Amino acid sequence: MFPSGLIERPANWVALAGFMGTGKSRIGWELSRALALHFVDTDKLITRVVGKSIPEVFAQEGEGYFRACEREVVQRVTRLDHAVISLGGGTFIHEENRRLLLSRGPVVVLWATPETVYQRTKHSDRPLLKVEDPLSRIRTLMNEREGVYRQGTIHVHSDGRPSEEIVEEVVERLWAWRDAQAAWAALPPDYDRATS
C-alpha cells in the first residue's frame, strides 16, 4: 500500500451501504485498491470481535445483540482514516449509524434489483432470508429500506456490470462530490444559500 500522502484521491474515507447482495464487499475491496486505502468489512469485523459467524450471532444472541455490535463497530470505523468501509445491509438503516457515517464522509449506496439480489444470495446463509419465499422477503425489505438508502451521498447501480466499471463510476462520482464540496466551502459566509 502507498503511504497516504503520495496519492491524490477524492476522499480518504468512504463507506459503502446498500441491501445485501448489491456488491458492497467486492466493490469495497476493489475501490480500496483503486484509492490505495485500507479495506474494512464491518460484518467480518463483527465476526472477528464476537468470535461467531453472523448466522450464529442471530441464532444464539438475537438480532438486537447483533445490531448493538454493529453500532459499536460503526463508532470504531468512523474514527478511522484512509479506509473504505463495507457496511452490512442493515447498518445504514439505523438512524444513529446513519448520522455518524454521513457526518464522517461520503456514503456510496449500491443498488440492484430484487431478482439480482436473490440470485447473488440464494445459496448463502443469511439469517433474514431464512423464510419460505426469500424473493418476496427481499422485495419487502428493499421497499421498506429504500427511503433510508436514498439518504446516501452517491448512488450507483451494480446490476449486470463488471466490478471494474462500477469502481470507475464510484471514483468519478467521488471526484464530482469532492469538487462540489470544495465549491460549496468557497462561498462567502454571507452568501444566501437559499437563493442558489
UniProtKB/Swiss-Prot annotation:
Native organism: Deinococcus radiodurans (strain ATCC 13939 / DSM 20539 / JCM 16871 / CCUG 27074 / LMG 4051 / NBRC 15346 / NCIMB 9279 / VKM B-1422 / R1)
Residue sites binding substrate per the record: 43, 67, 89, 145
Name this protein carries in UniProt: Shikimate kinase
Function, in words: Catalyzes the specific phosphorylation of the 3-hydroxyl group of shikimic acid using ATP as a cosubstrate.
CC cofactor: Mg(2+)
Residues at which Mg(2+) binds: 25
Keyword ATP-binding: yes
Catalysed reactions, as listed in the record: shikimate + ATP = 3-phosphoshikimate + ADP + H(+)
GO molecular function annotation: ATP binding; magnesium ion binding; shikimate kinase activity
Record's keyword terms, sorted: Amino-acid biosynthesis, Aromatic amino acid biosynthesis, ATP-binding, Cytoplasm, Kinase, Magnesium, Metal-binding, Nucleotide-binding, Transferase
Quaternary state and interactors: Monomer.
